[in-house]
Amino acid sequence: APLLGDKYSERCMFCTDDKHPNDLLEKGHIDYIVKRAIGLGVEPITAVKVACHNAARYFLLNNRGAIAPGYLGDFVIIDSFQDFNIERVFKKGELMVDHGVVKDFPAPAIDPYLTERAHSTFHVEHLTAEDFTDARPRGIIGMVNGEITTVDAGYSDRIDVEYDVLKIAVVERHKNTHHIGIGFLQGYGLKSGAVATSVSHDSHNIIVVGTSEDDCAAAANRVVELNGGIVVWDQGKPVAEVPLAIAGIMSDESLTCLLYTSDA
């Protein structure tokens, strides 16, 4: 909020990254950031300008980001600056959302070639426990709950669930190089099975954490079978999974369906 005073606000934009489906549905997107900024003392007009006009100007969308002659009629109507609840959404001057009810609109046309490519991004041979087995001592990554930073937790040459030392691996999945980086993780708290995901910035290879090499292999293989996603594997089967078949990082389901799947 201090950056959004008169001196720096012209050079600021709002953005989100990796918003969970429930966050989007329950809290919102850029509108939620605007609401938070206003709550932290930013002038409402400044917050809206940063969200709309600054972003449009940066991306050279010169006919968007403001309500003025020559601009597209893309705008929202809110109840108040204090609450900032969006009541109506207009796109090119046409009412598209009215108090939460979305008007039907045609899906965008996507080249079939691009669709096929986006659903065929995993090039990984079948993985086995041996692929995750390495007797050499490896560094232990110490997780810090709620923080992006980690700590050096020493070394290990084996999994030790009692002391929360788990196997962690990164499996290259784009070019079938069979490159697998292996290490250990402490602080995750997993007691059985494994968790694997293809959402792993920025290369989005497969990351798997497990209590055994067999579970690591099984969870990673299941991610490949799904063409991407998040898998919780335990006792020889997937106990929870969220398919992300578009490039391994996005769902082709509706927001409501994805919310139900991820909550389950």
What are these regions (language model features)?
Residues Y260-A264:
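Conserved small/polar residues in nucleotide/adenosyl-binding loops
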Residues K19-P21, F81-D83, E94-M96, V102-K103, ...:
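Short, glycine-/Ser/Thr-/acidic-enriched flexible segments
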Residues A129-T211, D215-A218, V224, G229:
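Non-catalytic interaction/regulatory modules that flank or connect domains
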